[in-house]
């Protein structure tokens, strides 16, 4: 930020050096800069950023250390007993062992354990540098995701499969982003209930001739295909109302992880999720169907499936989560999923613009991957037996992502349909 001769703030000039480069410069010149985190206290400190080579000389283990805030050229060999970074040492050897096993498998051997060599060849050392830098980028990405999330659930990121880093040009959002030609009108009226569960006829679902969707524990009890009407910002009831579930956001800790079977990124839960519990929303940019057709032609060439029609009553709008989205962007398809989609209405009652919520179809164990069916359908017998009004039918379900190209399914379940669409 520049200042003019009168001390007033002037134009903003983009810095030509990165933050780490400026930190390195400060340390080289022995200059303190509070804005860069370089103070007198840590000016001469040495912090290990990562380990990127290893050798064993006689009986002494030595590690080539990249020091934080210093260029690669100033990396030094250090004996193990000088290093206090136990987690980095453990991760270094874990990465090394995994890569050695991968190479052994590629060579056709069936080793289940490998011995660390006395010296690493150049390709191994190069791999460990790339892996260390990737971990740094993924940590930074996880920090960015958690800084942007407005929900309770924490997000972790993990890649123990390859060297893929954070996706480019992906922006984390917590609610729909309204695109050109789309207008969302917020509701101006709400229920007057003091206890929304005691008055079946007067609360928000009853006003639209529908049953309450949740039980007292916030678990969905209506069948897939029926809409969910939650209490809104104009309702008299408070935030503890049992009819406020989706609007409270994600409550669970999740991990975005790299799959080992070619399905890209996936999402696993780090907590047990009970059957019929709300898990997450599918959010993205709301665009017109015409714009979706245009973008779809581009996505066809990329093999992506982030376009999700909002055709609860008519196909007018589409959610595009390719660039703007939340953690649902990374949820994979399965022909036998553990998530089910519901249309939800809260502060906007336009039936062309429902919110899309995922609920657990069964109890989901800690560490289990979350999936939904990209080509979801409902049993017509179930629809007919639980029919609530003459307008309900198969078309009442939220659509799957746009069915544009024939994509091979890799879900691996016994009932796999072989193709997504």
From Swiss-Prot:
Q: Where is the SET domain?
A: 252-375
Determine the domain of life of the protein's source. Eukaryota
Per UniProt, Zn(2+) 4 binds at 335, 409, 411, 416
Biological process (GO) annotations?
A: cell differentiation; methylation
Please provide one cellular component term from the Gene Ontology annotations of this protein.
Answer: nucleus
Q: Which GO terms describe its molecular function?
A: histone H3K9 methyltransferase activity; histone H3K9 trimethyltransferase activity; zinc ion binding
Zinc found in the keyword field? yes
Domain Chromo, by residue range, is 46-104
Q: Which InterPro entries match?
A: Chromo-like_dom_sf, Chromo/chromo_shadow_dom, Chromo_domain, H3-K9_MeTrfase_SUV39H1/2-like, H3K9_Histone-Lys_N-MTase, Post-SET_dom, Pre-SET_dom, SET_dom
| Broadest EC class assigned to this enzyme | transferase
Broad class of the protein's primary localization? nucleus
Cite the binding residues for S-adenosyl-L-methionine.
263-265, 306, 332-333
The Pre-SET domain sits at 189-249
Give the reaction(s) catalysed.
L-lysyl(9)-[histone H3] + 3 S-adenosyl-L-methionine = N(6),N(6),N(6)-trimethyl-L-lysyl(9)-[histone H3] + 3 S-adenosyl-L-homocysteine + 3 H(+)
Which keywords appear in this protein's UniProt record, sorted alphabetically? Cell cycle, Centromere, Chromatin regulator, Chromosome, Differentiation, Metal-binding, Methyltransferase, Nucleus, Repressor, S-adenosyl-L-methionine, Transcription, Transcription regulation, Transferase, Zinc
Binding of Zn(2+) 3 occurs at 196, 231, 237, 241
Residues that bind Zn(2+) 2: 191, 204, 231, 235
Intracellular or extracellular location(s): Nucleus; Chromosome, Centromere
- Give the EC number(s) listed in the UniProt record: 2.1.1.355
Can you tell me which residues bind Zn(2+) 1? 191, 193, 196, 203-204
Cross-referenced CDD domains: CD_SUV39H1_like, SET_SUV39H1
Protein's job? Histone methyltransferase that specifically trimethylates 'Lys-9' of histone H3 using monomethylated H3 'Lys-9' as substrate. H3 'Lys-9' trimethylation represents a specific tag for epigenetic transcriptional repression by recruiting HP1 (CBX1, CBX3 and/or CBX5) proteins to methylated histones. Mainly functions in heterochromatin regions, thereby playing a central role in the establishment of constitutive heterochromatin at pericentric and telomere regions. H3 'Lys-9' trimethylation is also required to direct DNA methylation at pericentric repeats.
UniProt similarity note: Belongs to the class V-like SAM-binding methyltransferase superfamily. Histone-lysine methyltransferase family. Suvar3-9 subfamily.
Write out the domain note.
Answer: Although the SET domain contains the active site of enzymatic activity, both pre-SET and post-SET domains are required for methyltransferase activity. The SET domain also participates in stable binding to heterochromatin. In the pre-SET domain, Cys residues bind 3 zinc ions that are arranged in a triangular cluster; some of these Cys residues contribute to the binding of two zinc ions within the cluster.
Protein's name according to its UniProt entry: Histone-lysine N-methyltransferase SUV39H1
Give the species this sequence originates from. Answer: Xenopus laevis
Name the gene for this chain: suv39h1
